[in-house]
Amino acid sequence: MADKFSFDIVSEVNMMEVDNAVNQARKELANRFDFKDSKSSIELNKKDKKITLIADNEYKMKALKDILEGRFAKRNVSIKSLDYKVQENAFEGYIRQTAEIISGLSSDRAKELSKLIRDSKIKVQAQIDGTKIKVISTKKDDLQLVIAYLKQLSFPLPLQFTNYR
């Protein structure tokens, strides 16, 4: 029997599901009555991991966000992975807003998460390893406590628990 157990904490986004969600949002946009005769659009830049929303006015921008977030939810992609930037004026009075798709734990977020695990007083070790955090313990129960603790927190990124050993 192993004397140490571990798992990894990651924050990854399935880009295929994001692509599917954006395509479904485009289809809904084309069929919605309130968007008839509108130049509103949703564009995905896979290379830069950015989604660009263009709308006629504030109301339609809010509706575009609702459509996109609804499709993300249906495809089981966390809305927490979207980081909306500031709205800006586009051509001919239109409004443009960019949403960056966040994938991976930055070093700041990893340190913050590691500190949260240490502050929980559960007897585990948290090691930052690039874009993931490895949590090690001698008891499986402690690892399960850490997972339960992190799930009940409202962390600003979607967290997945992988590589159980």
UniProtKB/Swiss-Prot annotation:
Annotated GO MF terms: nucleotide binding
Matching CDD domains: YajQ_like
Keyword Cell cycle: no
Key words, A-Z: Nucleotide-binding
Gene Ontology cellular component list: cytosol
InterPro entries with a match to the protein in the record: DUF520 (IPR007551), UPF0234-like_C (IPR035571), UPF0234_N (IPR035570), YajQ-like_sf (IPR036183)
Function: Nucleotide-binding protein.
Stored PANTHER family: UPF0234 PROTEIN YAJQ (PTHR30476:SF0)
Family: Belongs to the YajQ family.
Protein name, as recorded: Nucleotide-binding protein TGRD_519
Species per Swiss-Prot/TrEMBL record: Endomicrobium trichonymphae
